[in-house]
Amino acid sequence: MADPSNAALRSGLNNRYRVLEVRVVRGEGRDPEKHLAVSSDPSLGDTELCVLQNGWESVPVVPGDIVHLEGDCSSGTWVINEQSGYLILYPDLLLSGTTISSSIRCMRKAVLSERFRGSECGSRQTLVGTILHEIFQQSVTNNLSPEKVEELAKKIVYGQKYLKEMYHLKLKQTEIMQEIEEYLPSFFKWTEDFVRNPANQNKMQLKLPSENKTGDCSSTVEIVDILDIEENIWSPRFGLKGKIDVTARVKIHRQGGIQSRIMPLELKSGKESNSVEHRSQVILYTLLNLERRVDPEAGFLLYLKTGTMYPVTGTRMDRRELIKLRNQVAFYLMHSTYKSAVGRQQSQLAALPPLIDDSQACKYCSQIHNCFLYSRAVEERMASVSFPPALIPIIEKETQHLKPSHLEYFSLWYLMLTLEMQSGDSKKGYKNIWMIPSLEREKAGDCVGNMIRVDQVQEVSEGQYLHSFQRKNGAVPGANLLVGDRVVVSGEENGLLGLATGYVREISATKISCLLGRNLSKLPESTTFRLDHEEGDCSIGVPFENLSKLMKDSPVSEKLRNLIIDFHKPRFIQHLSSVLPPEAKEAVASILKGLNKPQKQAMKQVLLSRDYTLIVGMPGTGKTTTICALVRILSACGFSVLLTSFTHTAVDNILLKLAKFKVGFLRLGRAQKVHPDIRKFTEEEICRSKSIKSVTDLEELYNSQPVVATACMGINHPIFVQKQFDFCIVDEASQISQPICLGPLFCSKRFVLVGDHQQLPPLVQNSEARDLGMSESLFKRLEQNQNAVVQLTVQYRMNSKIMSLSNKLVYEGKLECGSEKVSNATANLPNLKMLKLEFADASKTWLKEVLEPDKPVCFLNTEKAGCRPSDIGIISPYRHQLKVITDLMARLKENRVEVNTIDKYQGRDKSIIIVSFVRNSNDENLGALLKDWRRLNVAITRAKHKLIMVGCVPSLRRYPPLEKLLCHLQSEAMIFNLPPGAHESIHKCNIL
């Protein structure tokens, strides 16, 4: 289950209670009740009682769960029953109305849809529905005439916005337009009936829950004003979220007078059914409205095909039952793992909600593959789980292509991903936006609060609005947000959560500009905003989806299962002549001239591969140059190449080199995340500059470039549905977890993984997941097939003294300098002579020695110096220390020196690097980061000419990797013992 131990508890409107005890109480002649002992006290000292009655006792709740309570509390007792109160289980888990309404027919599908989000793949019907929504929303907002609505429809269908989806589904714009036109008469009829001339409309029965009268409830409904479209509301009170299609001000005319309400209007483009699922969504939207306004008590359901509108009343009973359903979905999601009470304490996967006994419904379910896969891989072994007899042969047929080893791989990775996701929940997720004040989040570097909107909002492109925010008072904190960061914009006051999401476009000392998906100009000018760094679950579905895809019954998935799970030996072609076209030989020979021997060997190995090649790029060995040469050679031979990496920076570093050689490529991904010099190659910029507005033009663009580049998370792009590449090259492969690395491999015939498992591994927060093997990258897993491995050992970064550290620590002497010049290079310090005069007194003699260029490696032992972590540091293993160092550098008015973590420095270098090891002897716990020799290896291989390390030798000797390094430094006389007060002398002279 999820670990709620660090959940923030509180009383009040957004209260959070921990359940301490659960008792079922049965009285004579009375229905059973559940009595919960709960506490909102962080120390769990003060407890209250929550009594669940009249059906609420069926809510699954166990000790340790976090709940929100709505209703009245009298003398420390909450009573939640048929008439009053709500219990919300795990309220910080916001579930959509779609998820909850789908759970009515099948709870299992609702739970799986939250995990495997990409399985709800697009369809013609979905695309048409999305376009119809937009046409309707814009036409009612702007009160357009029928002629203008037809113009708008053509503009949207023949515009750029939906081209990718049409390409994905192999649809023509003319087909879509024909279908859209069938709906337009109903749009006009609805506008006539409810907006322009409501008095002529047939009366509808609408009784609001607050009305006591019985009898005739007939009324006419008039839409007075459209207040918002796609209004995004998060409700941490009810654990709900949703985008309301249309928020309208409505007048209800009846005999007794006129009532005014702000109500949700839900649009449906499919068959008119007035089904319980559709009605449930509207009822949930009435609950969402409570976050921002008076209870609307009802909403409307409009079927766009017919123009028929149904009133949907949000009765207490309906809301209550839907909240109970929501609680069940939340329980299964938050209790997806458990630890057995006896025996080994390893976490295990829990059962999903039971399978429904309806093979016809299962047949058309989008989650059928994942549902049956989980049944076979996980639940089949559970004594407590039984399957409907009619489904057993269907489950076996759906999964018969999978071996036991494949099912084991699936269940292990599903468990590890779930553990990691639960571990990340406390540190990430959206809940900190409503549970932690902006000032507190700001201090932690995750938010900028107290902002007001300035300047006019500009619509930069369809659905993209440029907003400028300025601090209400004071300067904008510098390091909290960076250009390209995803942000969630909320109002500082309660109820205005998650107004819009988008990206930081520009930052200055006084202003932050963001590109948002919604226009916030309708909000009052006095609204104060907070901009939170989005670390939410936008990418959570990708690894689960890739894992699911690996288990599919398809040729590409079968090949990858054989290679990755069953370790089939990679195959190679015997002769280079059979893959090298005669017309490419001259170009290939020319490219090879600029490479060293190991790099040439790598080129040959890749060309001869039928399955995969691993290139070990040791520090400074020209990994980017090698990949660039490889892409040029493959391109010259007529092969198509998918180039990918975990980070946008790594992709762009290769593309910057490729651009110099005039190799054509297409860069996928948001322009904001791409290097400025590469933006002209992005799909976004090309579509804009070439005015691409047809599916044919888009297809031509995709087919015109043999090289396509994207980050690993970008493989859900439509191009990959239709295009198979000859080669896929994955840079930083040793840093990418297996399920994420799988994504691009589905799109290629052969793949090349480039990395070095002696450097940073995939980042895993959960210690149990790490122990189970989650930090093993695909690169490391496949490295056992040594015939597929090529090592790059000639390095051009470090001088020989710096290189010797890594050779001793990790590489067993394999690294060698590329030339004498590299071997003997020292730091260029033109002002050193002048500085030496400043260091004349005895307290600074150590500084003279340390700065000598002919001493390339120095370890400054701070044992006696009393040097605090905040005094020195450029690379640090700890993010918290970075803020301290950055602030110090700002006070020194020095902004040219880059301060970053080890992880951020991977793949990069500088002439001089200072590494600050921040632990001292007072620290009780050994830092996990300092125990990791791979991180240490990265830290000591970033400097070209001078490496200065700062730390307390006795404290650091407790870490095995550092003990080994310190022994080598001691034997080479590279450790300098600083005198007491050494740090004070630094402040007195201007070194920077």
From Swiss-Prot:
Organism listed in the record: Gallus gallus (Chicken)
A Pfam family this chain is assigned to: AAA_11
Keyword Cytoplasm: no
GO MF annotation terms: 4 iron, 4 sulfur cluster binding; 5'-3' DNA helicase activity; 5'-flap endonuclease activity; ATP binding; ATP hydrolysis activity; DNA binding; metal ion binding; nuclease activity
Record-given protein name: DNA replication ATP-dependent helicase/nuclease DNA2
UniProt function note: Key enzyme involved in DNA replication and DNA repair in nucleus and mitochondrion. Involved in Okazaki fragments processing by cleaving long flaps that escape FEN1: flaps that are longer than 27 nucleotides are coated by replication protein A complex (RPA), leading to recruit DNA2 which cleaves the flap until it is too short to bind RPA and becomes a substrate for FEN1. Also involved in 5'-end resection of DNA during double-strand break (DSB) repair by mediating the cleavage of 5'-ssDNA, while the 3'-ssDNA cleavage is prevented by the presence of RPA.
Binding site for ATP: G617, M618, P619, G620, T621, G622, K623, T624
Cofactor: [4Fe-4S] cluster
Matches recorded under InterPro entries: Dna2/JHS1_DEXXQ-box, DNA2/NAM7-like, DNA2/NAM7-like_C, DNA2/NAM7_AAA_11, DNA2_Rift, DNA_replication_fac_Dna2_N, P-loop_NTPase, PDDEXK-like_dom_sf
PANTHER family: DNA REPLICATION ATP-DEPENDENT HELICASE_NUCLEASE DNA2, DNA2/NAM7 HELICASE FAMILY
Residue ranges of the region described as Helicase activity: 489-992
Annotated localization: Nucleus; Mitochondrion
Domain of life: Eukaryota
Cofactor, free-text remark: Binds 1 [4Fe-4S] cluster.
Keywords for the protein's UniProt record, in alphabetical order: 4Fe-4S, ATP-binding, DNA damage, DNA repair, DNA replication, DNA-binding, Endonuclease, Helicase, Hydrolase, Iron, Iron-sulfur, Metal-binding, Mitochondrion, Multifunctional enzyme, Nuclease, Nucleotide-binding, Nucleus
Sequence similarity: Belongs to the DNA2/NAM7 helicase family.
Lineage per the UniProt record: Eukaryota, Metazoa, Chordata, Craniata, Vertebrata
Predominant localisation class: nucleus
Catalysis performed (reactions): ATP + H2O = ADP + phosphate + H(+)
